[in-house]
Amino acid sequence: MKKICCFFCLLLFSDRVFCWGFYMHEKINYHAVFLLPPQMMILFKPNIGFLSEHAVDPDKRRYILAAEGARHYLDIDHYGMYPFAAIPRDYKTALRKFSADTLQAYGIVPWWIQIMMGRLTKAFREKDKEAILKDAAELGHYIADAHVPLHICSNHNGQLTHQQGIHAFWESRVPELFAESDWDFFIGKALYIPDLSDFIWARILESAAAADTVLSCEKEISEHFRPDQKYAFEERKGKTVKQYSTAFATRYETRLNHMVERRMRASIFAVASCWYTAWVNAGQPPLDHLQHDSLTISEQKEYERLNLEWKKGIPLGRDCD
């Protein structure tokens, strides 16, 4: 029996799934471009393929840099109860209170977003087209991760409540089933963020507050589905894999009041607004003369190394799921 259970677990997780999934990170950056003003669109839209493709680079980097993993999450419940007043919102204050090792152990995503915002603002100010596109693509990744409830709690894959696999279910399986056919990505336009720290921490607290619901609803619905109804076998990339069934996913997303769609829409808006804010803070430099030329030899080698290490499949530090 134990061997059979292990076999099914391997089938269920045979496709590596990352934060929001590669597919959804690409979609979030893609849709964020269309919320930008024309002065930014002139650079971002022609390079929408680059911004989408390289949205997943931070996940790939977890395979070559041990420190990368902590940039994707925050085990906020380690620091007490909602609204987690014990955590200083300022990074330097948090360092003095908890130490770098503690912060690294329990995640630094809200502070890392602010660091990446500083990098993007600098790139805009210097009119460095390669840095603008690279930093914008990667900033979008971290912002999107902060909108995932299971990235903001220690029970990040249901491992503490016998719900292993819920992480990939929420952020990959559900979006892949419904995003293209049912979800609405007409969101409006990007807005300037006057206080970045307040904005990011508000999103962090939203995710933290939703984590319990993500877990409890899955457990509740599971009581009404037999195992053969909850899961289904599908062909994927030439392999038979065990997935959550469409019927179960539909019931779950409905029970969550379409939370996954709402968090994705919020991610798109936040990514676009952060890009826009960085540009405004840099003095709104004209971007019409910037074109994204071919990658330099060193840039090409960096991306090739990322892809090579990712394909090896050995993440350093804590895995996302």
Residue map of PLM features:
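Positively charged n-region of N-terminal signal peptides that target proteins for export
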Residues: 1-4
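Sec-dependent N-terminal signal peptides
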Residues: 6-8
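Short, linear, compositionally biased motifs with a strong N-terminal bias
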Residues: 10-11, 33
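N-terminal signal peptide c-region/cleavage motif recognized by signal peptidases
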Residues: 14-16
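N-terminal, motif-rich segments that launch catalysis or mediate targeting to/interaction with membranes
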Residues: 18-134, 138, 149, 154-247, ...
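Functional cores that coordinate and move charged inorganic groups
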Residues: 140-144
